[in-house]
């Protein structure tokens, strides 16, 4: 991986970790800084989310400081200029989910464009 690719992947990882931080999730404005205006998600529940609906979840305290999400096996790859694909496992309150995100570089920085969660066996 080139230095430029490594920096892009690290920027996406940093953004992903911020979105999992309960202190970031508590403030819609901070979450919005990290989500692309065209953001969509297919959750582990099978539900489809957009920016507005996901803000309801993040601001509702779905991740508590007492029980933070545990991330493992995080990896990323640049799939096109300005686009990074991340995958990792997230463990939260006894539930293990295989997660996948697409991040794209915008005029305001790296933003999550798409996210999907699949329950892990």
Describe the role of every protein-language-model region:
Residues 2-33, 38-121:
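A beta-strand edge to alpha-helix "cap/lid" segment located at domain peripheries
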């Amino acid at each position: 991986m080139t230095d430029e690719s490594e920096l892009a992947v690290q920027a996406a990882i940093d953004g992903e970790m911020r979105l999992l931080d309960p202190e970031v999730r508590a403030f819609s404005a901070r979450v919005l800084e990290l989500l692309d205006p065209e953001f969509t998600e297919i959750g582990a529940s099978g539900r489809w989310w957009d920016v507005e609906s996901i803000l309801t979840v993040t601001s509702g305290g779905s991740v508590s400081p007492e029980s933070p999400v545990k991330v493992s096996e995080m990896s990323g790859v640049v799939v096109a200029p300005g686009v990074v694909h991340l995958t990792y496992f997230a463990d939260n309150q006894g539930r293990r989910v295989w997660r996948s995100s697409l991040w794209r570089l915008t005029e305001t920085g790296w933003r999550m464009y798409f996210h999907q969660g699949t329950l892990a066996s």
